[in-house]
Amino acid sequence: MKVITTAPTERVMTKSIPIEQVAAFAEGPFQGNPAAVCPLQTWLPDSLMQAIAAENNLSETAFYVGSEGRYQLRWFTPRCEVDLCGHATLAAGHVVFQREPHLETVEFSSNSGPLMVRRLGDQLTLNFPVQPAYPCPVPDRLEAVLGSTPEACLMGVDLMVVLADECQVAALAPDSAAVAELPGRGLIVTASATEVDFVSRFFAPSCGIAEDPVTGSAHCSLTPYWAKRLNRSDLLARQLSARGGMLRCQLTEERVLISGRVIPYLSGVIHLDC
């Protein structure tokens, strides 16, 4: 995680920047996880991209540079740059497909390696690396944060805890300051479910996100865990945030395929006084 000051210190020649806002993993309007996407000709200064992300005040803003289906991609929360973001990658893929409708596959290079987005009908599919999580001792203060004792606790990029049932996941209302003191990028809370295979929620206050509506990257850890526990590789997941979101997940060796719908919300231009 790289924290960048939100006050731009460099002047640029760009006077306007296109911006799209779309909801990833959405089943309808005002659902899923909204992300802003800014297609660029060349990279802006880091401080300016961070300032734009802070002004957007969405969980992530994606910026990409490139053409003809091959791009470089970066993601910024309102507070910092992150190395991987699933929903904003799905959103960026949607924007590329709208601008280059002849494409069926988009390849992004990123700090987490190559990332692919494919489209099939109204579904887009991410091809992401597995982010394994391993059993670990229960951190101090975790039970106080959860208000219960977890069935399992694992550590990877994020701290992942398994609760007894989906009702406990839905009812969780953790204190953001307490969550920020836990190890890892954020806190994944998950449980098995009845209408889908598993449910989850994701909290990352240290990245400026009290709760993420739908978190594609968290499913890079959730999918291998539940695939092993349920003994199957194709899974249906729901994230139980207020907006909610549905994800279809498939484990294929060391990669996770994560599919969902994208619903566009707005198109516009960012105007800058340079």
Describe each PLM feature range.
Residues 2-6, 10-85, 89-274:
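Active-site proximal loop and beta-alpha junction motif in alpha/beta enzyme cores
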